[in-house]
Amino acid sequence: MAEKKQWHETLHDQFGQYFAVDNVLYHEKTDHQDLIIFENAAFGRVMALDGVVQTTERDEFIYHEMMTHVPLLAHGHAKHVLIIGGGDGAMLREVTRHKNVESITMVEIDAGVVSFCRQYLPNHNAGSYDDPRFKLVIDDGVNFVNQTSQTFDVIISDCTDPIGPGESLFTSAFYEGCKRCLNPGGIFVAQNGVCFLQQEEAIDSHRKLSHYFSDVGFYQAAIPTYYGGIMTFAWATDNDALRHLSTEIIQARFLASGLKCRYYNPAVHTAAFALPQYLQDALASQPS
């Protein structure tokens, strides 16, 4: 039997992960990027950009449930939601499950990403692009949040790692723009990497966000594809009570929402804000 090809991730220099490649569905390598989608028996369809896994069919639900349901249920009455990035459609899919949300705006810098993911990752969006509340804006995220006249109750930054095109979504200009178009009491969240290996990302985001929001922190989830420990999500708001809601309050909102989840539940919600001591110490040691 012929040995299967292997695809090796190149995110870290000293160690990493690999996937056996059952079938390459798409591969484009240009001077600007290397994009591949392949099938793997354990994780289904896998999409990687420039040597870094972006999403897989098998475990994407963990990431997307935690990025959406935590801020939306903590807020309690969000009507207008902004997604920055999210071209694969899975973040949109989870937001559309909240029936009280009235509008969902998604800002994607490349229209081709949306059509590409609709073709190769159809399970991610699961038809959510057809939701009447959804509006797609093709624009740079930093430009949009600093120019739009719209305001939002929850902003979700589904950014890649802070390298290449994704770097702008970790800048002060982006965070300031998000504060500008966030309604009073609103919540901003963003993926912030695996803190054991990418601790400087969390420290940098915490320092920058603290210039614009009075309550800045992180919550976490364990996502197999993003190996090396827990993945952290940045959390920023001016209503510090929202990060400390009881499990009972979240439970009541969860039951009222009618949501059925595979990872998220109210106990996971409240526990997610408990951070390992090494991260707490690193954040506390930074100058104010």
Curated annotation (Swiss-Prot):
One of its GO terms (cellular component) is cytosol. Keywords: Cytoplasm, Polyamine biosynthesis, Spermidine biosynthesis, Transferase. Spermidine binds at residues 64, 88, 158-161. Gene3D superfamilies: Spermidine synthase, tetramerisation domain, Vaccinia Virus protein VP39. GO terms for molecular function: spermidine synthase activity. It catalyses: S-adenosyl 3-(methylsulfanyl)propylamine + putrescine = S-methyl-5'-thioadenosine + spermidine + H(+). CDD domains: AdoMet_MTases. Transmembrane segments: none annotated. Its EC number is 2.5.1.16. It is found in: Cytoplasm. GO terms for biological process: spermidine biosynthetic process. PROSITE patterns: PABS_1, PABS_2. Pathway: Amine and polyamine biosynthesis; spermidine biosynthesis; spermidine from putrescine: step 1/1. It comes from the Bacteria. S-methyl-5'-thioadenosine binds at residues 33, 108, 140-141, 165. It is an enzyme of class 2 (transferase). The active site is at residue 158. Residues 9-238 form the PABS domain. Pfam families: Spermine_synt_N, Spermine_synth. Homodimer or homotetramer. Catalyzes the irreversible transfer of a propylamine group from the amino donor S-adenosylmethioninamine (decarboxy-AdoMet) to putrescine (1,4-diaminobutane) to yield spermidine. Belongs to the spermidine/spermine synthase family. This is Polyamine aminopropyltransferase. It comes from Escherichia coli O6:H1 (strain CFT073 / ATCC 700928 / UPEC).
